[in-house]
Amino acid sequence: MKKFKDFKVLLVYPNFPMASVLLPAGVSIISAILKKEGFQCRLFDTTLYKPKGESQEEFRKKLHQLKTSSNMEEKVSTKNSDPHDDFKNLLNLYKPDVVGLSLLSDTFEMGIEYAKIARSKNIPVFAGGIYPTFAPDEVIANKYIDFICMGEGEYAILNFCKALANDESTDNIKNFWIKKKDGTIIKNDLGPLVNVNELPYPDYSIFEPERFYRPMQGKVLRILPMELHRGCPYTCAYCEDPSQNLLYKSRGIAKTYHRSKSPKRVIDELHYLIDKYGANYIYFNAETFFAMPNKDFIELADVYSKEIRLPFWLQTRPETITEERIRLLKKMNVSNINVGIEHGNEKYRKEYLKRAMSNQLIIDALKILDNANLPVTVNNIMGFPDETRELIFDTINLNRSIKSATINAYLYNPYPGTALYEVCRKKGYLPKEGDEKAIDTHLSTEAFPYFKTILNLPTISKSELCGLQKTFVLYSKLPRNEFKRIKIAEQHDEEGDEMFDLLSKKYKDVIQGKVQLPYEIKEYLGASH
């Protein structure tokens, strides 16, 4: 038995090197809860290690999906050491009693490398996060994983650590699956959902100071995330949130996974983040900002505009955008809005993605943001099941019909637990044993999850998908008389790269106002601009 103050927890956050991602709230809240109960807690985060080749930021700049920013190097220095060696050294120095991994499907294999190192030193390993929640059998089957935590893990992990510290059985801890020495698995059910208004404030002190910085609209800012709510009331087929709703509803635990923090809790937490960590920019961490009750938004807007006033970024859906809401956001000091378009074909978007909105609605919503002079980043995804080149050009044409400051174009990868994953599985599009999982034909660096695809589609090749992603912004912004040359730029060879570089110079003239932007509103859908 150990006193809690002598029990050491080491959390591991496997991440792609120098990926421009925000601080994860999950491990931060877990650390806060453990420390509040007296446990020691540290974090090993792989984000700041030097990538093999370009960083994700450099790669996105090349594809014109990220504005050229002030030098990140001035704020963030990369680590040139080997992360596995550093992890071994930390284990020897810190001597943790347990190691916990935070896993996504994209980072599972990376995380297992660290689990293997920990188990070689006889340190028990548990894994939590979205991947163990929706692929629990695969994760617990790995020989380097001893326990998994499904669903919300904050207090489940606390109870688990208490049991370990007290030399008590972990067999009956809610949310946990336990692998016994004989290989049998104890599968406990989920516990109740947490009250998001009663959670402690996140402990971001476990992260290195450089992790607070992120490029945003051409600047490098000290950005901190603010969790507004958990889950989402919408039912997008590619997203895990609807599966979270089903996970808890099917067990009779809750009617929905989606819960919002109160405006008072949000404001109090924002004051804490500013005072404790010196935030000068806020990212409202929510799948859909306006999923909160409208009365809560009105209250939040009023207090934020009086007490906080920091610039902020949010993401939302087109159908939630109204002139009145945007007026209040501007009063709050909104800096950038991220809007999910995802696909430009109405029929496909409704049938496959379960996003029932018209292209005209999207155009009208983006027009409201344009009239308000707000920079907009639009998200697009391609490589969905049964997608064709023609369908992808529907998405490109929709992007040509709206005004945006930045365009993101991601390649779809199916996540276990989602409705669209099941479509891919039933149609045989998932890689089989021994198949090459992904192709990185236009990557000169370590593969990032949104710039590769694992699907084997009969309707379009991986190489063509990568070429369309490479040129998506050029197709969306340059005049149509350049389409023949852009098609050459899709190629993954010397000729294609030379043409891409040539057209990229022309694109820079476009964004500098030297060439007229192709907002083909009258041509496309008969809209006006």
Question: Which role does the model predict for each range below?
Answer:
Residues 36, 50, 98, 126, ...:
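Conserved C-terminal portion of the radical SAM core fold
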Residues 12-14, 44, 102, 128, ...:
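Short hydrophobic segments within beta-strands
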Residues 22-29, 110, 265, 296:
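Conserved alpha-helical elements of sugar-nucleotide-dependent glycosyltransferases
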Residues 197, 202-377, 397, 513:
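Radical SAM [4Fe-4S] cluster-binding motif and immediate context
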Residues 1-14, 19-20, 29, 35-36, ...:
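Radical SAM enzyme core and accessory elements
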Residues 7, 30-34, 40-49, 75-192, ...:
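Glycine-rich beta-alpha loop elements in corrinoid/cobalamin-binding modules
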Residues 16-25, 103-108:
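A short, glycine/small-residue-rich beta-strand->loop->alpha-helix junction that serves as a flexible
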